[in-house]
Swiss-Prot record:
Belongs to the metallo-dependent hydrolases superfamily. DHOase family. Class I DHOase subfamily. The keyword Cytoplasm does not apply. The active site is at D272. Pathway: Pyrimidine metabolism; UMP biosynthesis via de novo pathway; (S)-dihydroorotate from bicarbonate: step 3/3. It catalyses: (S)-dihydroorotate + H2O = N-carbamoyl-L-aspartate + H(+). The gene is pyrC. Substrate binds at H59, L60, R61, N91, H276, A286, G287. This is Dihydroorotase. One of its GO terms (biological process) is purine nucleobase catabolic process. The lineage of its organism: Archaea, Methanobacteriati, Methanobacteriota, Thermococci, Thermococcales. It holds the Pfam family Amidohydro_1.
Length: 404
């Protein structure tokens, strides 16, 4: 073995005391005893080895918006937060809607990314090219481009489609985007899914009724996500600070509680990391940074008994890898040796000044939390230790099932 991690790790829902062997950047063995190896990382008591986490909803800006975020700063933020794979949303400026722009995006990622990555392609009346996933906006959000015919665009997709479900007709009628805007779009998306029968992923579900619609429909090829900001914040927080403007908006306490009630039925948690500078936020930009806080908030919730640590593994590693058909990611022998080592006892205060994102602020400023990512390993190499991102960018594009 080139590398052996020794200590407690999560496996099949249980905490195991043993070791994990790594060779050529891949996991070779999970063992109950201490494996032999050239290089060992001994994980102390109170610390646990998790798989590297996958965030299927990240806006990394760059291109003409390098003042908001770059692939370099955004992926540094990712590994700082224990995220080893990011899904790059294509509503950039310019948007990723043709082969040339997609290739430009890949070129930048190859040079600048500290995390592994999946490349998205935006559909809004254009023809698709091969990408890792497709994104459709049913109503205008950041970037302003949305699909006038969701079903037609979704039917064209060559792989799984992630959809921002807010009804464009209702947005013009209700610009503050009350629950009906999301609920109506989710119903339309589910109706299209029944007809088209292609994999569909509904982003950032925020309402009780929207979630009910998805769960009752129970369509095998439809998945969905919830975000930490919809789990931890409400409309009352937005009323105190207009910086918390986001699409879909923060909801009432009853919606937030319902998301927690149904968390066992939620397959994926994703950040929807959407950085803007404070100046842009003060001018009304919608979106919240989240890559460096999402895992910490969830670890704190684990410590408070709101969910299990295994839930974090399922919703941010196993399920994303399975649903998005990522061949080289997950938690098993032969998968990439990506790890997030967490200290469940570490108490700390969230401060934006300690983060890598260019956003320069966080919705959770001053929150005291218990639980922290202390080391991130990407394909067998340490990329973050004790808040410091280490080495050069070495991110690679994910491998999809069937793409050999």
């Amino acid at each position: 073995m080139e590398l052996v991690l020794v200590g407690k790790f999560l496996y099949n829902g249980r905490i195991i005391d043993g070791s994990i062997g790594v060779k050529d950047g891949k996991i070779t063995k999970f063992s109950l005893r201490e494996l032999k190896g050239d290089n060992k990382i001994k994980v102390e008591k109170g610390k646990i080895i998790l798989p590297g986490l996958i965030d299927v909803h990240v806006h990394l800006r760059d291109f003409n918006e390098t003042h908001k975020e770059t692939i370099e700063t955004g992926t540094k933020a990712a590994v700082h937060g224990g995220i080893t794979t990011v899904f790059d949303m294509p509503n950039t400026k310019p948007p990723v809607m043709d082969e040339k722009t997609l290739k430009m995006r890949e070129f930048l990622f190859k040079k600048k990314s500290y995390a592994d990555y999946a490349l998205g392609f935006l559909l809004a009346g254009n023809e698709p090219v091969k990408a890792d996933f497709y994104k459709i906006f049913m109503g205008a959000s950041t970037g302003g481009i949305y699909s006038k015919n969701f079903e037609e665009d979704y039917a064209k997709a060559l792989d799984i489609t992630s959809v921002h479900a807010e009804d464009y007709e209702l947005i013009s009628k209700y610009p503050e985007r009350p629950p009906i805007v999301e609920i109506s779009a989710i119903k339309k998306a589910l109706n299209a899914a029944r007809k088209v029968k292609k994999p569909l992923h509904i982003c950032h579900v925020s309402t009780r009724e929207g979630l009910k619609e998805i769960l009752e429909a129970n369509i095998p090829w439809v998945s969905f996500e919830v975000t930490p900001h919809h789990l931890f914040l409400t409309r009352k927080d937005y009323e105190k600070s207009k910086l918390l403007k986001v699409y879909p908006p923060l909801r009432d306490e009853s919606d937030r509680r319902y998301l927690w009630e149904k968390l066992d039925n939620v397959p994926i948690i994703a950040s929807d990391h959407a950085p803007h500078t404070l100046e842009d936020k003060e001018r009304g930009a919608a979106g919240l940074p989240g890559l460096e806080t999402e895992v910490a908030l969830l670890l704190d919730a684990v410590n408070r008994g709101m969910l299990e640590l295994w839930d974090v593994v399922e919703k941010m590693s196993l399920n994303p890898a399975r649903i998005f058909r990522i061949k080289n990611k997950g938690w098993g022998e032969g998968k990439d040796a990506d790890f997030a080592i967490v200290d469940m006892k570490k108490e700390w205060t969230i401060k934006a000044e300690e983060f890598y994102t260019k956003a320069g602020w966080t919705p959770y400023e001053g929150w005291k939390v218990r639980g922290k990512v202390i080391m991130t390993i990407l394909r067998g190499e340490i990329v973050m230790e004790d808040d410091e991102v280490i080495g050069k960018p070495r991110g690679e594009r994910i491998v999809k099932e069937g793409d050999d």
